[in-house]
């Protein structure tokens, strides 16, 4: 049934996306048209009408008049429209041409705003590619098929990714990001799905483990025979009482009864020190031997109290993460509990339903989907160890989001390079846009979206960058074809032959030559930094061991990174990257630049061999090459 509903929805969406193919004729909208609103418009209707008027003003060169009465040539907004939305899902919309006029309305909190942005994108070709790049062509008129009738239901109730542009309000509105953890959208703008009291890893604070560690060590997890503040004991009734008290305190202070959904995160700390005490072990053994059993039981009891207190629009959120990833047996989450399944151990060069590398996760996904009414996902989309390198997951982004939707997932957060202001190389803006569009519609024409982005962001050279991205995707994964989020730089892509590497270099040169503005050239060079980092890590092209100028090329790469504003090479660099020992820069691969000193034994060995390779090529160059490949 789920698959059937999915296919029907996709078919309806596609019909709405390409109505021209089925139109007998078009209606023509120009600057003489008016925007029709109700006599007493709501704040949401006023916002929607103003947004539409402002953008149409940019299109036509004259802002259309907003009126409360019109007989013809109008776009009706909200309650002024005649569309029937009774069968439209919450936060969905309907855009329909009726008697030659356009009628736009939506449901629940966000539907109307989503509808206006969809109208602008679909019929005015408005695209918000980044927080700084919005494309809105000027036209004398807009053509809309006379039989247009677009009905849309959101694929997910909560969507989020970070990077840089997704933090921007207008970007979030245009591209359908709804989670409130990284953005603030006022109620009239559609609002957000808000986490109250913290987004993740909250259980230590809620259970006050530091406060009670000395007076009540039994509140702490017993792990490997020792009590630790890493996690609390989830079968201790006093711990449950403390946590419940603090959840209720958060709700007393921050709850909004008018919000459609608010979430309190009761999520395990970021470690694997789950409690192994006798009570926890017995409970887990009684539920399939799964550590998630104590987690689900714990949050279920909190959720019951929250519901009893009348917080009907509140859900309690918890993780299925590392030790709690697999679903338990004989216990199910309450209907006001969110299970947030994390894909942290997955391979990202293959779709998540690939048995060879992701079979365990996919089983966990389907198991949770069977027992959980509100399944959320925490997904990943960058190399957190070496973020400056290429992370070629481009071919799985859309497929994975489709897999989540088809397995009853209700909310999705794709964690990316959230520290992009400190480490902006690679294809951060492109990947953020790809993710956002797929969250908005997992079945969109992603190739067309990527082409449009590349043209806008990289300029005329965008077509060459797109070819490069496609080549990187084909090389995704190490020698075993896997790609994980803590891989060494060179292992993120299978080796390029010298011919292939030179071809990629040539495409970068063509892209730079085609650029028409300094901004386009800067965007190209910034993305190219990731390719240069990968080549330096894999000893390719100008970074070959057989090139005596290899140290100078690495020095140039390092200086270009600093000039581009890069002050971190990964999630946790741990040192001042502007003050790295010059010897490391010149004679070690970039993956060793994290350490910032020569104390690392492997780094010392590599530097010695590289110095010999520079002094005595080509013999030691060959030795250095094989040493690096073996020990990378």
Predicted regions and their residues:
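Substrate-binding cleft/loops of secretory-pathway carbohydrate-active enzymes
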Residues: 317-345, 389-393, 422-431
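Acidic, contiguous N-terminal accessory segments
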Residues: 10-99, 130, 134-149
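Catalytic domains of carbohydrate-active enzymes that cleave complex glycans
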Residues: 435-630
């Amino acid at each position: 049934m789920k698959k059937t509903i999915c296919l029907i929805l996709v078919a309806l969406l596609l019909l709405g996306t390409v109505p021209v193919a089925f139109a007998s004729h078009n209606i023509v909208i120009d600057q003489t048209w008016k925007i029709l609103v109700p006599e007493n418009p709501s704040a949401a209707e006023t916002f929607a009408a103003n947004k539409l008027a402002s953008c149409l003003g940019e299109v036509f060169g004259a802002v259309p008049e907003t009126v409360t009465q019109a007989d013809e040539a109008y776009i009706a907004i909200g309650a002024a429209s005649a569309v029937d939305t009774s069968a439209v899902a919450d936060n969905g919309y309907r855009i329909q041409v009726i008697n030659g006029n356009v009628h736009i309305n939506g449901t629940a909190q966000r539907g109307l705003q989503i509808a206006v942005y969809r109208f602008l994108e679909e019929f005015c070709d408005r695209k918000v590619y980044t927080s700084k790049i919005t494309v809105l062509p000027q036209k004398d008129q807009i053509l809309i098929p006379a039989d247009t009738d677009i009905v849309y239901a959101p694929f997910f109730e909560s969507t989020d990714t970070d990077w840089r542009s997704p933090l921007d309000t207008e970007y979030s509105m245009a591209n359908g990001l709804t989670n409130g953890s990284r953005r603030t959208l006022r109620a009239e703008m559609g609002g957000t799905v808000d986490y109250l009291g913290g987004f993740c890893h909250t259980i230590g604070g809620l259970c006050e483990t530091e406060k009670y560690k000395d007076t009540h060590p039994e509140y702490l997890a017993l792990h490997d025979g020792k009590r630790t503040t890493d996690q609390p004991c989830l079968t201790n009734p006093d711990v449950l009482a403390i946590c419940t008290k603090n959840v209720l305190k958060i709700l007393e202070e921050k709850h909004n009864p008018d919000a459609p959904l608010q979430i309190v995160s009761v999520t395990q700390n970021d470690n694997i020190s789950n409690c192994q005490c006798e009570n926890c072990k017995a409970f887990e053994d009684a539920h399939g031997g799964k550590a998630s059993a104590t987690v689900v039981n714990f949050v279920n009891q909190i959720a019951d109290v929250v519901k009893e207190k009348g917080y009907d629009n509140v859900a309690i959120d918890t993780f299925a993460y590392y030790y709690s990833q697999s679903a338990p047996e004989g216990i199910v989450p309450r209907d006001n509990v969110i299970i947030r399944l994390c894909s942290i151990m997955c391979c990202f060069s293959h779709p998540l339903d690939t048995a060879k590398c992701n079979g365990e996760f996919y089983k966990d996904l389907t198991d949770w989907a069977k027992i959980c009414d509100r399944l959320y996902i925490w997904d990943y989309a960058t190399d957190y160890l070496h973020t400056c390198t290429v992370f070629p997951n481009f071919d799985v982004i859309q497929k994975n989001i489709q897999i989540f939707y088809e397995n009853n997932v209700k909310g999705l957060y794709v964690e990316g390079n959230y520290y992009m202001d400190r480490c902006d190389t690679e294809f951060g803006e492109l990947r953020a846009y790809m993710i956002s569009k797929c969250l908005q519609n997992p079945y969109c024409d992603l190739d067309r979206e990527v082409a449009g982005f590349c043209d806008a962001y990289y300029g005329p050279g965008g077509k060459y960058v797109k070819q490069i991205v496609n080549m990187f995707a084909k090389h995704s994964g190490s020698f075993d074809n896997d790609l994980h989020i803590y891989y060494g730089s060179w292992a993120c892509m299978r080796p390029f032959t010298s011919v292939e590497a030179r071809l990629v270099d040539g495409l970068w040169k063509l892209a730079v030559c085609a650029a028409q503005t300094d901004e386009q050239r800067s965007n190209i060079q910034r993305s190219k930094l990731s390719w240069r980092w990968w080549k330096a890590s894999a000893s390719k092209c100008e970074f070959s061991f057989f090139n005596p100028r290899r140290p100078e090329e690495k020095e140039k790469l390092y200086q270009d990174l600093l000039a581009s504003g890069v002050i971190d090479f990964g999630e946790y660099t741990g040192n001042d990257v502007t003050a790295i020992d010059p010897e490391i820069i010149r004679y070690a691969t970039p993956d060793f630049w994290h350490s910032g000193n020569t104390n690392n034994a492997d780094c010392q060995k590599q530097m010695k061999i590289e110095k010999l390779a520079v002094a005595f090529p080509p013999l030691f160059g060959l030795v250095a090459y094989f040493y690096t490949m073996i020990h990378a």
